[in-house]
Amino acid sequence: MADPIFFKPSRELTIGDVADFTGASLRDPKLAPRSVERLASLKDAGEGALVFVEGKKNVSSLVGLKAAGVLCTESLADSVPSGIAVLVSRHPHRDFSAVGRMLFPASVRPESWLGETGISPAAFIHPTAQIEDGATVEAGAVIGSGVTIGAGTLIAATAVIGQNCQIGRNSYIAPGVSVQCAFIGNNVSLHPGVRIGQDGFGYVPGAAGLDKVPQLGRVIIQDNVEIGANTTVDRGSLDDTVIGEGTKIDNLVQIAHNVRIGRFCLVAAHCGISGSCVIGDQTMLGGRVGLADHLIIGSRVQVAAASGVMNDIPDGERWGGIPARPIKQWFRDIANIRSIGQSRKDASSDE
């Protein structure tokens, strides 16, 4: 439920507005003026709520439903109880999310943590920093020398932007974020605790132990990237670490030096991407995936959760397991292991 204490709707909304905004087909046009008071899950629905449902396996969830309206596919429309506005959509979840973003814009990009706009007198901003009109810098933020920040960008309380970094327009830098040796594009979101541009993990054997390898590269984060809380992105050693346009990275991910991630990738929580890996476009890594160093992972690849990848993966393939291998082979290996275990169990019971 969207608690109005935290998420105030940007406007009043009717069923007709939802149909117009999403392009969904309203079964009964007479219900267009009905008010939508809130967005809700099926289990939390009630009078005034807009919900969505997709997939025939969820048809039982519609029994006894009370709501102002339902976004659903054509195959489920006849199962919606009478009196509820039916909005037929090819993509109910996507349309429901679009309504949520329109109605509660602060839920996807906070406008301010402290309820203030403009440049706070309690922020430290170096005189050589250049901040465009329309940017917000909250109390306790630190902006180093030579930094540039674009219009519409929010630098939240206690964020630290190191010298000569560049941040584009309409980006969001949350509390506790540190940025150094980095160029960040437009519409980028860095959630609390993100670390960008610290030195990578590089050592060589020396005369008296381990000598540190200088990390002289940068981090380049392209437009429309989102990085979750407490994720770390190390700067390159000589080459740059690059996060491609539109890529979304979950919380608690480690991205090592010289990694290059392509466009529109998804990286789930607890992944570890070792140094100098190259990942193509539209690739998805499930939670807790680990990549060995210097791997080349193709475009449109899917790697199952908790997999350990030790080899390159060609474009378009699905891999899983430890060590990771093509998904069908992994399934066969699991089946064979189970079969061997069952055979041994049967043999021991016959003795």
Swiss-Prot record:
In short, the EC number is 2.3.1.191
One GO term under biological process is: lipid A biosynthetic process
Reactions catalysed, as given in the entry: a UDP-3-O-[(3R)-3-hydroxyacyl]-alpha-D-glucosamine + a (3R)-hydroxyacyl-[ACP] = a UDP-2-N,3-O-bis[(3R)-3-hydroxyacyl]-alpha-D-glucosamine + holo-[ACP] + H(+)
Q: Which Pfam families does the entry link to?
A: Hexapep, LpxD
* Signal peptide segment: none
Mind listing the GO molecular function terms for this protein?
N-acyltransferase activity
Q: Which UniProt keywords are listed?
A: Acyltransferase, Lipid A biosynthesis, Lipid biosynthesis, Lipid metabolism, Repeat, Transferase
Pathway per the UniProt entry? Bacterial outer membrane biogenesis; LPS lipid A biosynthesis
By its UniProt entry, which CDD domains does this protein fall under?
LbH_LpxD
- A GO cellular component annotation in the UniProt record: membrane
Top enzyme class, one word, equals transferase
Under SUPFAM superfamilies, the record lists: Trimeric LpxA-like enzymes (SSF51161)
Mind telling me which InterPro entries this protein's record contains?
Hexapep, Hexapep_transf_CS, LpxD, Trimer_LpxA-like_sf, UDP_GlcNAc_AcTrfase_non-rep
Write out the catalytic residues in the record: H257 (proton acceptor)
Q: Which HAMAP family match?
A: LpxD
What family is this protein classified in? Belongs to the transferase hexapeptide repeat family. LpxD subfamily.
On assembly, the entry states: Homotrimer.
What the protein does? Catalyzes the N-acylation of UDP-3-O-acylglucosamine using 3-hydroxyacyl-ACP as the acyl donor. Is involved in the biosynthesis of lipid A, a phosphorylated glycolipid that anchors the lipopolysaccharide to the outer membrane of the cell.
Q: What is this protein called?
A: UDP-3-O-acylglucosamine N-acyltransferase
